[in-house]
A protein has these predicted regions:
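A short, well-ordered alpha-helical element
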Residues: 357-368
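N-terminal glycine-rich phosphate-binding loop for ADP-containing cofactors
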Residues: 1-342, 349-352
Length: 368
């Protein structure tokens, strides 16, 4: 059975590369070269000479722990080990790793071969050298890394998965049908795929289990929608009808609900210093391909309107408003300043906008 999985994996890789040839991203020779560097195997002992090993098995804590214990017993103590988990604590997983200072989280995004975003997550015992090496390595292979604290859901999934779940709740409550929710979501966040299309593409079980993990850690607000569980159990995709003309009142309800949930969760992220507002923008812009990120929406609506939008959620789920729902906390860090001897170095960090200059960048340049 394992050999079939290897064959399927290689076939998927080959299809992606051939698509790259058709789009003139790769030459046929380059594809042959890449495929020649891939050595599929079910024999873990062949990992003994690897310098970096990234685990990407399904989200089962016992399976991951067992795998890391096995790998730790095979490879040298300086081999860097990483998990692609999107649900579990890196510090918890590190308990299964000998020499946990060499362990960290490297969370890639769908489609990993095309998506530039990667979340880099330090565990309690991750060494600075391992962290720095992985930052440099990710940049060298063309990724745009964001750094986040070790918290369930990290950055992007912490707000993206509740966005999916809230879309199902809206459908469940009869406020709008799936087609209308898709239309409103795409217009509000500037994305090409709405929540239901994305769940169909990446797997409804993945959305459900990710939301369930958040619920178990963070409480009632994160409870998976009943229809999400039902749809997963049906083993069928969501039925999405063609885009339709949407009633304006319905559009506003859907848009405001999805915006409120997203900004509330991002406020919680900022409260815990899991990342910066700039990292949220980079995560949404690069990882999710949202042209209108939560930070963009917050700054467009303004602090008072955002607080007004999240009030119904706070009342319904008996929550307090995050402390960092103020304008200053939602300014993305586009410019970093560093002094090297007598030279000042300004670094642009706005890859989601191709490092283009906008009024906020100009303001930060002047202050820098």
């Amino acid at each position: 059975r394992e050999e079939k999985f290897l064959a399927k994996g290689l076939s998927n890789i080959k299809s992606t590369l051939e698509e790259g040839v058709s789009r003139r991203i790769f030459t046929t020779e380059r594809v042959t070269e890449i495929l020649g560097k891939i050595s599929p195997t079910t024999d873990l002992s062949r990992l003994v000479n690897c310098q970096l090993i990234i685990e990407a098995v399904f989200e089962d804590l016992n399976v991951k722990n067992g795998l890391f214990r096995h790998i730790s017993s095979i490879v040298p103590e300086d081999t860097i080990l990483a998990s692609n988990t999107s649900s579990f604590s890196i510090s918890e997983l590190a308990r299964a790793v000998s020499h946990p200072e060499r362990f960290l989280g490297l969370h890639f995004f769908f489609h990993a071969a095309k998506n530039r975003l990667v979340e880099i997550v330090k565990g309690d015992k991750t060494s600075e050298q391992v962290f720095d090496n992985m930052m440099q390595f990710m940049q060298r292979i063309g990724k745009d890394p964001i750094v986040c604290k070790d918290a369930h859901g990290f950055v992007v999934n912490r707000f993206f998965v509740p966005w999916l779940n809230e879309a199902v709740r809206i459908y469940e409550e009869g406020i709008a049908d799936i087609a209308a929710i898709e239309t409103a979501a795409c217009r509000t966040f500037g994305c090409s795929m709405g929540p239901f299309a994305l769940m169909n593409a990446t797997g409804i079980p993945i959305a459900y289990h990710a939301q369930k993990t958040l619920y178990e850690v963070y409480g009632a607000f994160y409870k998976p929608a009943d229809k999400l569980l039902q749809q997963m159990n049906s083993k069928s995709p969501w039925e999405i009808k063609p885009e339709q003309i949407i009633d304006w009142d319905v559009y506003l309800q859907v848009s405001e609900r999805l915006s409120a949930v997203t900004m509330l969760v991002c406020g919680q992220i900022l409260d815990k210093n899991i990342c910066t507002a700039g990292d949220i923008t980079r995560g949404a812009g690069i990882g999710l391909k949202w042209r209108k990120t939560p930070v963009n929406i917050f700054n467009r609506l303004g602090q008072d309107r955002v607080i007004e939008l999240v009030q119904p959620l706070l009342q319904k789920w008996d929550m307090t408003i995050p402390r960092k729902m103020d304008t200053n906390s939602w300014i993305p860090d586009y410019i970093s300043v560093e002094k090297q001897d007598n030279v000042g170095v300004l670094t642009f960090n706005r890859p989601e906008g191709l490092n283009a200059i906008n009024p906020m960048v100009i303001d930060q340049l002047e202050k820098g």
